[in-house]
Amino acid sequence: EQLDNVRIPDFFPEDDGIKSDFLTNYKNIEKLDQQIGVIIAQLKADGLYDNTIIFFFSDHGGPFPHYKRSIYETGLRCPMVAKWNDDAWKGKTYQLVSFVDFAPTILDAANIKREFPFEGVSFYKKDQRQYTYAATDRFDGGTDMRRSIQDKGFKLIYNGDTTSPVYKPVKYREQMKTMRVLDSLQEKQELSAYFSNWFSKNKDRFELYEVSEDYYEMNNLMSYPRYERIFKTLQQHLVTWMEESDFGHLSESAMLDAMFTRSMTIPKLNVPKLILKDEGYLIESNNLYASVGWRNKNESVWKIYTANELILPEDDFEVLLFRPGYEILLKTFKK
């Protein structure tokens, strides 16, 4: 009966499995609201609420396909409420805000002078942003290169890789009932045009949408000559932004080459130490800021190791250490 009352976006097929996933998400949001209410009640009880600035905003679209990790509006546009520490600025605003704007905004609201420049701009009692920018690159084990720019009316998407689908396999997401339904319909070629495009093996180089009227970005306007001027303007600003601040066109190996000249060597991590305890082992990293993982030799998935955790390997096992800018260390130990 609960599922009958669950509303899902029109582009999803009507399916109880999908509705069940959405119902779980809605209940999580309800629980979150209750927890936020507890924090606000505590602030009021402590006499701190009136002088507290609160930003309350969503995650990037939840785990649903075409939402989280997506460069479309379903993945980028987030609801947000800002509660200031005075009554000078109330009501709704329809200005563009990017997450990089939070740092300068907080400094402005706290009346703290900036000591260095920010990429973002303050939206505290101001409306300074003409465009927002977005990027997608790494999808867990896979990669993509998509960039976007938008103003209040239109969004332009640039696809650096046109030979792979928008869809990227993400193991966590593949466990959802929603993905199992979509995968099944895809195999039967029974998907709607919306998700068929998502699974399509190729992408157009550019996509242009009038997001003020076409929130779900169903109608690519690139083939309409009357939008040529809008396309050229957005493209020019996007190229400028990419040239000034985007290193995504470089492969990860090329980034390393840029970071380390030929006269420099990539620093190495220290070999971790194993400490026998009871029936298992403790891993002593001996490396500041390094992440540690381990797995049995016959396993494909790594387990994240936390300090002072006792591991119980079944047989020979591997330990992996990672720290950005350092050579990855992989060591096999015999039980």
Regions found by a protein language model. Give the residues of each.
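Residues embedded in well-ordered beta-strands
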Residues: R77-V81, S148, K155-I157, G293, ...
